[in-house]
From Swiss-Prot:
Protein name: Multidrug resistance protein MdtK
Organism: Escherichia coli O9:H4 (strain HS)
Any one GO cellular component localisation term in the record: plasma membrane
Main subcellular location of this protein, as a coarse class: membrane
UniProt cross-references to PANTHER family, sorted A to Z: FMN_FAD EXPORTER YEEO-RELATED, MULTIDRUG RESISTANCE PROTEIN NORM-RELATED
Length: 457
């Protein structure tokens, strides 16, 4: 029992800074929305439309680079720190190549925006302008993620938290300058949010690089000599590990976007209630997601040390802590669902629907916690391909079709509206949790030699 308590302390010490970093990131998006809304409703809508295209694109790159964390954790645990610098350098090359592709996609996103049904031309132009300003931040964001993954792979999660809050503090005044046109800068409105956010990502990257250069604990990595040219073999391996994660993230983000589109014809009350419940459940999701990042680090480190039993302990502890957290957040959600809905909107119909949907959100929080921490465990074992297959099957083969049938057809019951999609979420997330656990048990029952061989690839 003592080993689980000790492991839980280590996991929480790693996870809490990640939680705070994620809160800072979420707050940046909130600040952009509020400040753009303060300028005009059109500008706020433009930022919202632009963000809906930016997020899937940049999260694809983010997911691809998540492969670095278990690689570095495993090298650190095995005492092969001399190989870390080369992996990080290849991570920067990969981030550079991917950012060029993302920038090309975002530059041409105007075709998508202008093809939207009945979109106001002025709104479309502002959304395109916002994206074309924001896309210059894509390299800065991805380079920052490489540096952050280096630190987190070495079990140092506090730098990412600090840089997140630096970014938030810089974002507010820079937004003010470019939205309203102060200190000689042009008045750009919502487009100014894109300029500010792009600048903030570069500031966060440069601040993280400055920290790494000064950190004594990384001196041996920083001083590593060798070529900085692209290494096709290393980059291929990072892509093999990262691409399934990137696709899984992409499918998850697009799932919720598709559901939002399917809910939109049902009316303002249904859309508002759905959005409130989704926004709140996304905030609660920060907890298991951060714990999953910590579990990846611990499992990778233990496998690097050659201890499959300690890796199992880290995995089981992460799941136990995650279920406890999810139980508490579910109780909190059920108990205060109406008060929470009132924070977003005071329309009685919207509040009633949102409170009902939050009951369903509370049901799936435990499944959601298990599946996301399970994904973190599999990343630690470098078994990322299964994450993609599980996510695709659970969300797109089971969750979305069942939600669609329940919400919009009478094949099973009378059309349930948004609640049908939320039952679909429960089906999808529960299926993902079950499949993640089955895959984890399959891996852990392998002979130790095979587990360690797979982890050292």
């Amino acid at each position: 029992m003592q080993k689980y308590i000790s492991e839980a302390r280590l996991l929480l010490a790693l996870a809490i800074p990640v939680i705070l970093a994620q809160i800072a990131q979420t707050a940046m998006g909130f600040v952009d929305t509020v400040m753009a809304g303060g300028y005009s409703a059109t500008d706020m809508a433009a930022v919202a439309i632009g963000t809906s295209i930016w997020l899937p694109a940049i999260l694809f790159g983010h997911g691809l680079l998540l492969a670095l964390t278990p690689v570095i954790a495993q090298l650190n645990g095995s005492g092969r720190r001399e190989r870390i610098a080369h992996q990080v350098r290849q991570g920067f090359w990969l981030a550079g190549f991917v950012s060029v592709l993302i920038m090309l996609v975002l530059w041409n996103a105007g075709y998508i925006i202008r093809s939207m049904e009945n979109i106001d031309p002025a709104l479309a132009e502002k959304a395109v302008g916002y994206l074309r300003a924001l896309l210059w931040g894509a390299p800065g964001y991805l380079f920052f993620q490489v540096a952050r993954n280096q630190c987190e792979g070495l079990a140092k999660t506090k730098p990412g938290m600090v840089m997140g809050f630096i970014g938030l503090l810089v974002n507010i005044p820079v937004n003010y300058i470019f939205i309203y046109g102060h200190f000689g800068m042009p008045e750009l409105g919502g487009v100014g949010c894109g300029v500010a956010t792009a600048a903030v990502y570069w500031v966060m990257f440069l601040a993280m690089v400055s920290y790494i250069k000064r950190a004594r604990s990384m001196r041996d990595i920083r001083n590593e000599k060798g070529t900085a040219k692209p290494d096709p073999a290393v980059m291929k391996r990072l892509i093999q590990l990262g691409l399934p994660i990137a696709l899984a993230l992409f499918f998850e983000v697009t799932l919720f976007a598709v559901v939002a589109l399917l809910v939109s014809p049902l009316g303002i009350v249904d859309v508002a209630g759905h959005q409130i419940a989704l926004n709140f459940s996304s905030l609660m999701f920060v907890l298991p997601m951060s714990l999953a990042a910590a579990v990846t680090i611990r499992v990778g480190y233990r496998l690097g040390q050659g201890s499959t039993l300690d890796a199992q302990t880290a995995a089981r502890t992460g799941l136990m802590v995650g279920v406890c957290m999810a139980t508490l957040t579910a109780i909190f959600t059920v108990s205060l669902r109406e008060q929470i809905a009132l924070l977003y909107n005071d329309n009685p119909e919207v509040v009633t629907l949102a409170a009902h949907l939050m009951l369903l959100a509370a049901v799936y929080q435990i499944s959601d916690s298990i599946q996301v921490i399970g994904s973190g465990i599999l990343r630690g074992y470098k078994d990322t391909r299964s994450i993609f297959y599980i996510t695709f099957t659970a969300y797109w083969v089971l969750g979305l079709p069942s939600g669609y049938i329940l919400a919009l057809t009478d094949l099973v019951v009378e059309p349930m509206g948004p609640a049908g999609f939320w039952i679909g979420f429960i089906i999808g997330l529960t299926s993902a949790a079950i499949m993640m656990m089955l895959r984890m048990r399959f891996l852990q029952r392998m002979p130790s030699a095979i587990i360690l061989q797979r982890a050292s690839r």
